[in-house]
Amino acid sequence: MIVRKIALNGWRNYEFAAAEFSPGTNVITGENAQGKTNLLEAVYLLTGGKSFRTRFDKELIGFGYTGAEVLADVFAFGREQTVRIVLRQGQRKQIWQNGVKKTAAELAGNFAAVLFCPDDLNIIRDGPAARRRMMDMAISQLRPKYGALLAEYSRLYDQKSAILRDWHEKPSLLDTLDDFSDQMCRVSAKLIRYRAAYASRLNIAAAPIHADFSGGRDKLTLAYRTVSTVEDALGTEKEIYYALCDHQEQHRRAELDSGQCLTGAHKDDLLIDINGQSARAFASQGQTRTAALSLKLAEREIFHDEFDEYPVLMLDDVLSELDAQRQAFVLNRIGGGQTLITCCEDARIAERTGGRVLTVADGGIR
């Protein structure tokens, strides 16, 4: 998959800017706060109409602008595509693919990208939400219908949470509680199967990458966990649903007392161990960085296995934090597809990869 060129209008700090990319390695240089990450964010938008930094489209529109537009030519799945995404203050985002109007859900699955940025260290260091988000971002590109399931689950979760919060003042709300609980169990069963299947593939793909990355010193293992009554997260949807219903019944009183949803896919986690110990609790800074980057490189391999072509790989200010040996390891693994690398350095990385250099400064790209 390749981004051939992109034009930005009113996007973040860009009044108007355009860039053409090499099908191989592209090194995007510039000082801090010049818009390097904003450029990657625009490329990521092409995967499904969503940012990796914010849920609110209004934040993507530059200060003082009434709207923003991203226009790009991409090549994916053996065909050329033109994608146009328009954002307007107070309006729904509009998307066109090859001149045909699309929804964000319809855009998903037509182009894929894998991103690694400094915040991805939180996959290892933070709580379960960071790891669920990592899985959800990947699965949404692999399985386009998954995004709609996430949106439905979020809606149900918010409505049930409101019932649990307000039922003391309005007891009649409890009339609908069991129905929302059942719907959450049904959608959770679907989400859990998707996530567990992805976690299994990620475990297989990441282990050898991490072993090579760490020089054979460390062993990375991943395990998916959901609520206690689900014995097999890779079981049938029906089995998982019934197990969730059991958990829900056992925790109904606790939900009413606490005002919190205690059953469902929002309780899931991906356990990450290094040498048999929790990476979150015991990993060093270097081990954390190595593990997080291994997961992202494994994600890229999963996409390749699925689509028989590599997604665009975006490395945002990553290589500067690695020693020379680890830099070489990463650069040796990114062949075969298009890569966008941001850094504040000079063209040394480009010289090592034979890549194209783009410079971002003063709201422009050259």
Regions found by a protein language model. Name each.
Residues 1-31, 171-312, 321-325, 329-332, ...:
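Conserved NTPase motor "head" modules and their coupling/switch loops across ABC/AAA+ ATPases, GTPases
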Residues 36:
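Conserved lysine of the Walker
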Residues 45-130, 136-146, 203-208, 240, ...:
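Nucleotide-state sensing region of NTPase/ATPase domains
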Residues 72, 338-345:
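Structural recognition of the conserved hydrophobic beta-strand(s) that form the central parallel beta-sheet
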Residues 122-123, 129-185:
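Long, charged N-terminal accessory/stalk domains
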Residues 137, 347-360:
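Short regulatory helix/loop adjacent to the ATP-binding pocket of P-loop NTPases
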Residues 316-318:
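Walker B catalytic acidic pair
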